[in-house]
Amino acid sequence: MVTTVQDLAEQLRQAVESSNEQMIAGLASAYSGKEREKVLRAYLSATGTTAADAIRKALKNGPTENLLAYLWDKPGDVRAKLIRNALSGKNDEAALIDLVIHCSSEDWYNTCTEYTTDYKRVLNDDLLSDIGTKEQWTKVFKHWILHKRSDRFDIDGDEKRLVTAIGKKDYDTIAEMLGTTSVSEYANIVRRAEVTLGKTIDQALSAVWSKQDLAVLLAAHYELLHPARLAFHLLKQALDGKKPDEARIIRITALTFDTCLAVKYAASEAGYDIGSAFAKALDKRLAPLIKILWRVM
C-alpha cells in the first residue's frame, strides 16, 4: 500500500495530538527535506494550522519543543528567525557561526527571502550593521554572505597567498580567500599549503588566532572542505564543553540532520562516539530524539 503525503500529514497530526515526541522526530528522520515540505503543506491544508504551531501548542515549553517545531517548519524560516534572535541584544556569536557560515548558497537565498517576508528588512544589511567592523572575524562574514565564488585558475599563487597570510597574521587576506574561493579550488590550495607549512591549516590558524577570530576562520575552513566536517566540529564543541550547549545542538540538528550519514562519517574518522556523547550530555527527554535524528544508538 502506497503511503501518500496526506497519509503522512495525518500520521504527524496524530503524533502531535498525542504528544508522541519520538514519533514526531521519527517521521522527520524518515523523509527528506523536500518530502517534509510537501507534508507541511498537506498538514496546513487539512488542519488549518501549521505543524510547527501545532507542536508548540501540544508540547511543554523547552528545548524539546523547539527542536520538534524546527523540524516541521520551513528551514529558511527557522534560520531567519534564529538569526533575528541571535542579533537581538548582545549578538550570539556562536549562533551566527551555526546559522551563517554553516549555510549553503541556496539555503542563504531562501533564508534572506523568508527574513524579508517576516520582518520587511534585508538580512545582509541587518547582519552587517549589527556585527559592525571592529572585530576581525566580521571580515569573514562580509565576504561569506555574498556567496560569490569562482575559480581563479591559480592554485600555486593562491597557495602562496594563504601561506604568506598566515605567516604575516594577515586576517584580511584569509577572510577574503575564504569568502571568494571556489570549493574545488580551496581543497587543492589547502593540500598544497599544508605540505608547505608542515601542519594542517587548522593547526596553523590555531597557532596565530584565538577566541571568535579563530572560531570563525575554522568554521569557514571546515565548511569549504565539507559541510559535514563543520557540523561535526560544532556538535563536538557543544557536547564536550563544561556544560553541554543544548541550543547549539538543537540548531545544528534541526538544520543539518538530513546529512547525518556524512556527519557520522566525520565523527568516525575522528574516533568520536557521537551517540554516546549525546546520551551523556543530554537529558532523558531530549537525548532519544536527537539520537533518532542522527540515526545513532
From Swiss-Prot:
Pfam families: ANXE1_4th. One of its GO terms (molecular function) is calcium-dependent phospholipid binding. It is found in: Cytoplasm, Cytoskeleton. GO terms for cellular component: cytoplasm; microtubule; plasma membrane. PROSITE patterns: ANNEXIN_2 (PS51897). GO terms for biological process: cytoskeleton organization. The keyword Cell membrane does not apply. It comes from the Eukaryota. Keywords: Annexin, Cytoplasm, Cytoskeleton, Microtubule, Repeat. Transmembrane segments: none annotated. Annexin repeats lie at residues 3-72, 74-146, 153-222, 226-295. The keyword Cytoplasm applies. Giardins are involved in parasite attachment to the intestinal mucosa and in the cytoskeletal disassembly and reassembly that marks the transition from infectious trophozoite to transmissible cyst. They may interact with other cytoskeletal proteins such as microtubules in the microribbons or crossbridges, to maintain the integrity of the ventral disk. Belongs to the annexin family. Giardin subunit alpha subfamily. This is Giardin subunit alpha-6. It comes from Giardia intestinalis.
